[in-house]
Amino acid sequence: MDWEHQQAPSLDDLETLARASFASLPSEFRALTGDIVFVVEDFPDESVMRDMELESEFEILGLFHGADLAHREAGLNAPNPTMIFLYRRPILDYWAEHHETLGDVVRHVLIHEIGHHFGLSDADMDAIEAKT
């Protein structure tokens, strides 16, 4: 590959990759989220840093924000849409330091953000990753 003319993936590139990765996940797993919005930012904002008690903006790759399953099953409308925040710079740093494709990294972040929010075990999430 000619790296001389390559650039790091943009915010839009990562959003496109996130949509494709999400679409490749098993339908029963995707159904947990309902309609979802992907928000890609370079770094988490100050409120996320404070709320998550992070010392560095590179400590977090993504964040799920939405109603839990019990809230949705009760038919209660969530005040905000379900969103997954992906943090571009930390994701790119992780990608550069590991032997995984960028698509695999993004898919892993999506699975773990959704899975942790809905209480799935690490074994459950590993099984979902194995299916993709």
Task: Give the residues covered by each predicted segment.
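Active-site rim/adjacent substrate-binding subdomains
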Residues: M1-V105, H117, S121-D126, T132
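Catalytic glutamate of the conserved HExxH
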Residues: V109, E113-H117
